[in-house]
Each structure stands twice: as C-alpha cells, then as structure tokens.
Amino acid sequence: TKDFEFFGRYVEYTDDSILTLATADAILAGRLSLVADYYVRYAEAYPSPMGGYGNCFQNWVIQKTRTGYAPAYNSCGNGSAMRVGPVGWAFDTKNDTMNAAKVSQATAMCIFLARKGASKDEIQQCMEQEFGYRFPLTIAELQKRYSWNGVDGEGNGGICQDSVPQAIQCALQATDFEDAVRNAISIGGDSDTIGCITGSIAEALYGVPANMCEKAMTYLPENFQKLVTEFEAKYGSGLRKTEGR
C-alpha cells in the first residue's frame, strides 16, 4: 500500500544511506577511484545499520580489512545501484557519468538525464535502448505481482536486473518525490534499496520539498549532515523551496 506514515516512529538511516554518503565523500575528496576504501571505512564506522549490509559486501569488507586487498566480487546485487546516486550529480557529460558509475550506470544515467531536463519518456527510452530494460506493468500491477522473488516469483528481487527497472519505474510513474517513494515501498521486495534508488532518481526529476529535506536531515548524525551540505553546495541538489504534502 502507498498509505503509510512517511516519517514514522521507527525511521532510521540505513546501509544504503551510509554507502551513498561514502560515495559522495569520495567524490568530494577527488578520490572516486579509491571509493572502495571509503566503503570499508564507513562500514567499519557504522557496522550495524538498519537494513544491514549484504553478506557478500560484509565478506568483502572483512577481507579488505584483514589483507589490505579484496578483488571486486562482480556482484549482480542491487547494492551498487543504490549507492551510486551522487555520481549522477557530480559529472556533466554522459560519458563521464557512465564511466564513473560503471556497473551502476542505469541509476546514474537517469539522474543525469533528469538534471539535464530530459522528459520521463526520453529517460524511459534511454533505459530501453541502452540497458534493455522493459516497463510493461503499471504500479498497481507491480503491487500485486512483485516481491523479493521478482515478478510472479520468477526472479530475485535482490539483484539489479530484477529490482533496478522496478525502482526506475516507480520514479517515472509518479507525480512528485513523495509519490515516487510511496510507489517504491508499496511494491514490496527489497524496499529500502528500491526506495533509495527511486528516491535518488525522483530528486532529480521532481525536486524534494524543503520541509521534507529538513525533516530527513534530523535523522542523520551531524557529520553526515555536514557531508550532505558540502556535496549539495558543490554539485547542486533537487531541493525545492516549496513545502510538501
């Protein structure tokens, strides 16, 4: 359902928030090529967030901490797609955005295109042509047919190909930022990650009401608030001065 309290009693920042901020920190420092070190540092500093880190990611952090080296594990999980949002704001050409995002290109490209004024139809066309994504179902149909096991139980909602298209669709088929996030939560599955991906795209598409930004910031520790402020001051944001619902 889309009918839930947006800032409820048990709201906390999650692993998705932490690693998204780690990406932003690496970009601000001009060290995106060393972003893996930032992920390890943040994961060690915040080891038990709501949502929890994926098993493959945790094992990768442990190996890198113990040995100083851990190869990319070539995950097809959706974690990479949820933490790439800052890339879509920090680069000003399509090629630079794609190169920086690498395996999480679809999310970053949606943000980049929205920033540059592309219509929702143009963004969908790009996703279909460049990534092979298809969007045959409405949000109402996804609410009935989507779960942790993908659409109709024929997939895996924890991997990119069975969650990123749905997250993009939740943003494109919304009327504003809040509606997009409500779409994402309502379809079920890996809700915090789908919500993170959808929200990052929806910010660039619709903007975020000022009162909603202010409320969300109260859930973050002071150092996270400072990082968000610095990143937005340098690269911009989707902040709207108008109030939300």
Predicted regions mapped to residue ranges:
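Structured, active/binding-site neighborhoods that engage oxygen-rich ligands
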Residues: 1-245
